Amino acid sequence: MNRGYHEIKEHGKREFPFNIYPCSIPVDFSHVALHWHEEMEIIAVKKGKGRITVDTVSYPVEEGDILAVFPGQLHAISCGNGERMEYENIIFRLSMLMGDNGDGCTVHFLKPLQEGQAKNPVLIQRNQPDHEVFGKVIQELDRFSEIRGNG
């Protein structure tokens, strides 16, 4: 992986590596430059529309869409001229969810994700089955983040 694009910012705290960042393009910044990091990132579009590029594939997104970017994947976020997008980045280390090496979920699902074996991001659009379930998970994470506070 190209080290020039490696984001090394610590998200959350060392003992609890989780944070939610509300963002708006173009209000907060004009775009999010191409980068990668070791954390999992879930991008939930709250309002408007834009484009999320993961590796070499560009995904048009709009209000309600949820996109999961796996550790190590190059990604960028942008909007077209005159477009706006409000979204939140939910960023966390997969190690927070892992059990010991005997745990089936850790061995067969989380470790492969952490080791970069996932090749395609997951895009969940409003009209897809289970979107409502994922939306509720995002709402719970938001609620948890409000209770926990910053950092």
Describe the function of each predicted region.
Residues M1-I66, Q73, V107, E115-P121:
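Generic protein-terminus/edge-of-domain signal
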Residues N2-N19, L74-D142:
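A hydrophobic/aromatic-rich effector-binding and dimerization subdomain
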Residues R148-G151:
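N-terminal core-binding DNA-recognition domain of tyrosine site-specific recombinases/integrases
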